[in-house]
């Protein structure tokens, strides 16, 4: 019988896809940690370590997905498209996702689906979001200075 809690027991981190190519979990773990700057995020959000780890593992899980499609916001997208977008996520995208969560006022029934949607859309919506914030702040500043 194998003792799974014994520290000497190790399994391969290699996941084999349908086409025979290997996806090394360690390789993607390193790539994602570096691209989102996970340690810097944890420094800047000291009370959000668990949430940040959850976001990191959600990205990793999505990148390693072997299905043909991934369901995001009630739409099926090719896994390769989703993987490509998730591998381009960076510190600012995660920061944006945290802001979206903080500013959300509606009840989220499925947090995983909600986070997948935010992360998938982040590269496309981040600029518009911050531009709207700047415009709003500027308008408030001019109104208050009169």
Locations of regions flagged by a protein language model:
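Charged low-complexity intrinsically disordered patches
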Residues: 1-66, 146
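Sequence-level detector for tyrosine residue identity
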Residues: 4, 9, 23, 28, ...
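A generic structural signal for ordered alpha-helices
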Residues: 19, 33, 37, 72-79, ...
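Amphipathic alpha-helical segments that form the core helices of the histone-fold
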Residues: 55-66, 73-88, 101
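Short, cationic/aromatic linear interface patches
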Residues: 79-146
């Amino acid at each position: 019988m194998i003792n799974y809690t014994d520290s000497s027991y190790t399994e391969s981190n290699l996941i084999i896809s349908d086409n025979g190519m290997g996806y090394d979990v360690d390789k993607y773990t390193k790539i994602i940690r570096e691209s989102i700057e996970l340690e810097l995020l944890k420094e800047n959000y000291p009370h959000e370590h668990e949430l940040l780890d959850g976001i990191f593992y959600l990205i990793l899980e999505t990148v390693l997905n072997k299905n043909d499609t991934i369901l995001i916001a009630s739409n099926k997208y090719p896994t390769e498209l989703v993987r490509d977008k998730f591998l381009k996520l960076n510190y600012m995208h995660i920061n944006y996702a945290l802001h979206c969560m903080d500013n959300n006022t509606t009840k989220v029934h499925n947090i995983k689906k909600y986070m997948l949607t935010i992360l998938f859309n982040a590269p496309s919506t981040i600029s518009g979001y911050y531009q709207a914030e700047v415009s709003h702040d500027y308008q408030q500043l001019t109104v208050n200075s009169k």
